[in-house]
Amino acid sequence: MNAYLDISPEVQTALAAGEPVVALESTIISHGMPWPQNAETALQVEQIVRDNGAVPATIAIIKGRLKVGLSKEEIEYLGKAGLNVTKASRRDIPFIIARGGDGATTVASTMILAAMAGVKVFATGGIGGVHRGAQETFDISADLQELAHTNVAVICAGAKSILDLGLTREYLETHGVPLVGYQTSTLPAFYTRDSDFDVDYQLDTPEQIAQALQAKWEMGLQGGVVIANPIPEAYAMDRGKIDAAISAALAEMDDKGVSGKDSTPFLLAKVAEITGGDSLKANIQLVFNNAALAARIAASYYA
């Protein structure tokens, strides 16, 4: 076992017994919303995973230890620390460990820690991707590279709509990462149920998705799978309204010179401000929806 890794007793017991486990990321706790809403939301997501037949494993770095499965107290610790917690992707993990620090895991680093522990299914809000204007900036999320070679299925509401969805899709295709639509043939765009882009495959049941994952990994085809699960109709936002908010947020980001790992939190916060908090409510609901589907996929995978 990895000397830096702490797997919670509940998660360890489930993994040893071949029971379904769902990984959850921690950036949404530290960077996604303020205290105490962040911790409350994270605990609700864990409960939704349990209600749908799996064990939740929220993942983070706390005091220099890689944690797979957090206690309520650890979730609250991250929630209170908020933006003081380092947003940790692949490159950051060894340095946070070396200084005994705290890290909130992105999609990429959550996948890494999940794979270390043997967790195959991960629920998040949306994956990172190719940023708009990347042909000049080369700003491409490390999430995509992780998906290319780490064997974890990521259930999300598509790529965050602040990104260039077309280029994100092309990048995934280049790296052989399947883009699966759950009960949809078009790629959902986070706050909205559809976009101008198709998925590679539409699968309509958790069982079909689990069978495809088993076939992929049993054949030794390395890499993740993106399972795009549209936001529930009742919480989906108007496409025109959200596009206008994103355009305004992007313009302000350029004016202020925000870039790199700060760009996504800035844009999400600005879009929430412009939409009067509607985008944050939508974000929470799509995470709940993804957690439920991920638990059902994990239950089928381990059935």
Curated annotation (Swiss-Prot):
Belongs to the pseudouridine-5'-phosphate glycosidase family. GO terms for biological process: nucleobase catabolic process. Its cofactor is Mn(2+). The keyword Hydrolase applies. It is an enzyme of class 4 (lyase). Its EC number is 4.2.1.70. One of its GO terms (cellular component) is cytoplasm. Binds 1 Mn(2+) ion per subunit. The active site is at E25 (proton donor), K160 (nucleophile). It catalyses: D-ribose 5-phosphate + uracil = psi-UMP + H2O. InterPro entries: Indigdn_synthA-like (IPR022830), PsuG (IPR007342). Mn(2+) binds at D139. Keywords: Glycosidase, Hydrolase, Lyase, Manganese, Metal-binding. The gene is psuG. Homotrimer. One of its GO terms (molecular function) is pseudouridylate synthase activity. Catalyzes the reversible cleavage of pseudouridine 5'-phosphate (PsiMP) to ribose 5-phosphate and uracil. Functions biologically in the cleavage direction, as part of a pseudouridine degradation pathway. Substrate binds at K87, V107, S141, A142, D143. This is Pseudouridine-5'-phosphate glycosidase. It comes from Hahella chejuensis (strain KCTC 2396). The lineage of its organism: Bacteria, Pseudomonadati, Pseudomonadota, Gammaproteobacteria, Oceanospirillales. It comes from the Bacteria.
